[in-house]
Amino acid sequence: MMSAEPRTVSTPAPSTPIIGVIGPPCSGKSTVARHLESLGGVWLNADEIAKSQLSDSAVIGELKSLFGDSIQMADCSLSRSRLADLVFGDDEASHARLRQLEGILHPRTRKILQSEIAKAKSERRPFVILDVPLLLESGYRDTCDEVWCLQVNPDRHQQLLASRGWNTEELERRSARQWSWKRKQSASTRVISNNGTEEELRRLVESELASVLQSK
């Protein structure tokens, strides 16, 4: 159950710490990021920023030059379903097209993230939540003052994955392209166990956040 009233951080820290949040699928990462946002943080979601770029005419133009006119609809918007068909296959050609897509979106997304972080710091916001897929592998560790890694016990995690329809083979393919979670935990500032209720997780997040803000 959600708590009746969200608790807020009323006093900004002297600086604006950047907290990277990572975790395997169904580990509670979005719940943590959303709760941190409710406590006064600026949530920067790289996936959402990247998706928003697909409405940019310059990006659509670059994608057309790579993948052809078929990805553009009659109203000049991008056909995301056609683009997905091109880049999310299992063959090497699809993988190559995905790398091309990432080569267009990732630099733009990084630039926007850097701009939003600078804005948050200039406005002396209490803290920033940096939510980036493959945050450690993508070179964002030095951007963060802290990295929080969500951890779920194996049995509970399997239940959560099954309940949300995750495909085991797809999960294994994803895992093969990134650091092991043991390595990620070692590279993180804090490992947060999500093995209780959602309310317990929120309380734990609040405690960890208080520790971060008090140290700044």
From Swiss-Prot:
Its EC number is 2.7.1.24. ATP binds at residues 26-31. The keyword Transferase applies. GO terms for biological process: coenzyme A biosynthetic process. It is an enzyme of class 2 (transferase). Pfam families: CoaE (PF01121). It is found in: Cytoplasm. The keyword Nucleotide-binding applies. GO terms for cellular component: cytoplasm. It comes from the Bacteria. Pathway: Cofactor biosynthesis; coenzyme A biosynthesis; CoA from (R)-pantothenate: step 5/5. Residues 18-216 form the DPCK domain. Keywords: ATP-binding, Coenzyme A biosynthesis, Cytoplasm, Kinase, Nucleotide-binding, Transferase. It catalyses: 3'-dephospho-CoA + ATP = ADP + CoA + H(+). One of its GO terms (molecular function) is ATP binding. Catalyzes the phosphorylation of the 3'-hydroxyl group of dephosphocoenzyme A to form coenzyme A. Belongs to the CoaE family. This is Dephospho-CoA kinase.
